């Protein structure tokens, strides 16, 4: 073969080799995530709870994690990272590898309210997370210590207006959904109460029971048994209509038309988590929510199972962020 012919053939072979290499790289890029998702999970999965043991996110996370562990052949374990109203656990999750092995049990406070009250977050509540699965929704409930001698919302409002500054209300931290719900209530009712923030909802509940504070607007689950036992007085749930678990407790909107704050709990992952992984965990959580044991447990906690798609959950998160940003701005509430 002549030299020009040899060079020509080598050139063709080189071009073909380059084409093959590029094609192989593209195939690998497409196949690798799918292969990883098919093998997922190949090790234990960590769910971060951005609050103390015993609060709503902790209870929901442990219940669903236990059910998933039985289904997938790997342990889904809870790791509590409380602090700054959910900021510490959220930041940790946002900066974790988006491989499906670290997710967060978020809520309306950590992934709704915080975007409005923190101006210096090291993560974006919307952009740095992908909503995976909504677990349940529940109203907040306004309760008072028995030392406050009232039985109805009308009696409470009359007492609060006659005794300005004498009532303290507890919350699980500045910017928690309990804090924001109470501030919205104060604004709409035209009353004055001092805020005492605690490091998590469990200490806040204990504080109200000890009469360190007299009032709390908190997620319904920790209060259900205490309300039904008569240890605290429930004045209203924070949804437009009464909740089926407490039919005798009025809706806040019956006294303050338009009042509506719904709490939610759900699983979110770091942005960039493979869609196949998100889809699988979503399906597993939705499946768990249909299990009789889970339904029964949610009923005892006064929570309504809320199976959903990742897209619908994302819409809820985005709407919550916009709403609480507006309320935080109007009430000049800042946590930093």
Regions of interest found by a model, annotated:
Residues 95-101, 108, 116-203, 252, ...:
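Hinge/capping helix and adjacent helix->loop/strand transition within the periplasmic-binding protein
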Residues 3, 9-24:
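Bacterial N-terminal signal peptides that target proteins for export
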Residues 11, 42-44, 188, 228, ...:
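An extracytoplasmic/periplasmic, membrane-proximal ligand-sensing/linker region
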Residues 37-127, 166-168, 174, 190-215, ...:
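N-terminal (or domain-start) structured segment
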């Amino acid at each position: 073969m002549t030299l020009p012919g040899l060079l020509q053939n080598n050139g063709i072979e080189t071009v073909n080799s380059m084409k093959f290499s590029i094609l192989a790289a593209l195939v690998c890029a497409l196949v690798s995530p799918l292969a990883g998702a098919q093998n997922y999970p190949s090790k234990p999965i960590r769910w971060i709870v951005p609050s103390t043991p015993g609060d709503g996110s902790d209870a929901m996370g442990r219940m669903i994690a236990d059910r998933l562990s039985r289904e997938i052949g790997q342990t889904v374990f809870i790791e509590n990272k409380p602090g700054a109203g959910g900021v510490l656990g959220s930041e940790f999750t946002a900066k974790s590898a988006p491989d499906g092995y670290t997710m967060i049990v978020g809520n309306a406070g950590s992934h709704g309210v915080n975007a409005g009250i923190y101006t210096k977050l090291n993560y974006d509540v919307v952009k740095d997370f992908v909503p995976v699965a909504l677990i349940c929704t529940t109203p907040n409930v306004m309760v008072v210590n028995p030392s406050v001698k009232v039985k109805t919302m009308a009696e409470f409002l009359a007492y609060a207006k006659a005794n300005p500054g004498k009532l303290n209300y507890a919350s699980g931290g500045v910017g928690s959904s309990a804090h924001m719900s109470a501030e919205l209530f104060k604004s709409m009712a035209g009353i004055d109460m001092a805020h005492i923030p605690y490091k998590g909802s469990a200490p806040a509940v204990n504080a109200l029971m000890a009469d360190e504070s007299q009032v709390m607007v908190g997620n319904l689950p920790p209060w259900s048994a205490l309300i039904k036992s008569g240890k605290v007085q429930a004045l209203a749930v924070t949804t437009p209509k009464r909740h089926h678990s407490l039919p005798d407790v009025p809706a806040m909107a019956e006294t303050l038309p338009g009042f509506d704050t719904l709490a939610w709990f759900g699983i979110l992952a770091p942005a960039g988590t493979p869609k196949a992984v998100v889809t699988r965990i979503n399906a597993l959580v939705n499946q768990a929510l249909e299990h009789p044991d889970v339904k029964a447990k949610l009923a005892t906690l006064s929570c309504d199972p809320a199976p959903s798609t990742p897209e619908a959950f994302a819409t809820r998160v985005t709407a919550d962020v916009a709403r609480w940003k507006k309320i935080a701005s109007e009430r000049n509430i800042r946590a930093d």
